Regions:
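Short, conserved phosphate-binding/catalytic loop or strand-edge motifs used
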Residues: 24-28
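Short glycine-rich or small-residue beta-strand-to-loop segments that form or flank ligand, phosphate
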Residues: 29-33
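C-terminal accessory/tail domains of diverse enzymes
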Residues: 1-22, 35-190
Length: 191
């Protein structure tokens, strides 16, 4: 029901002339509650993202400029440190998150540099949410003027919730990238 209300807000914004798409350097950031997550499930989520983010970027046709700056792939230093140390506490997970990316100096600052990743755990430690920064609305076409799309937003939210649930239910997850010879097949079999 919350998604229905959010979709209606998007429709109202679109009709009022609001604009959002990658050409305007606008991304769609989805925050989901971190409730029920543990350091282990957050490590699972990290590994799930690391193994599928290239596939997601291709399937979603993400803007390369955004990937290079505002929604980077999982930091390899973080990934290696996380899977080596396997923290058992949230504070231990936070230490790995910030220290592995050399962003330990301003953990409580809103614009901490660690936040600019597709999967952002800075939001977890400052807001209690897990943020997915990888989405964007499609550029306007076919007579549409602004790119906002309620159905697209709904599918983004549902994907984030599914990834979160997958991480909670998995006994473990590998960071090894999935095959990408046939991206459409890989995406279908994964989801």
């Amino acid at each position: 029901e919350d998604i229905d209300a959010l979709q209606e807000i998007i429709r109202i914004l679109r009709k009022a002339g609001a604009k959002s798409d990658a050409s305007r350097m606008c991304g769609v950031h989805i925050h989901i509650g971190a409730n029920g997550h543990t350091p282990k499930t957050m490590r699972n989520l990290t590994n799930i993202m690391a193994s599928h983010e290239g596939l997601l970027a291709e399937a979603l046709e993400l803007d390369r400029n955004r990937i290079g700056r505002y929604c980077k792939m999982v930091d390899p230093r973080f990934l290696a440190s996380l899977n080596k140390k396997k923290p058992s506490t949230m504070s231990g997970f936070a230490d790995v998150w910030y220290k592995s990316q050399n962003e330990d100096y301003a953990r409580s600052h809103h614009y901490n540099g660690s936040r600019y990743h597709m999967l952002n755990f800075h939001a977890t430690f400052t807001k209690g949410t897990i943020e997915f920064r990888l989405f964007q609305f499609d550029a306007p076409k076919d007579g549409k003027q602004n790119g906002l799309h309620a159905g697209q937003l709904k599918s983004y939210i549902q994907l984030c919730l599914a990834l979160s649930q997958m991480a909670k239910e998995a006994k473990g997850a590998s960071p090894k990238p999935q095959q990408n010879e046939n991206p459409k097949y890989a995406m279908r079999t994964w989801l």
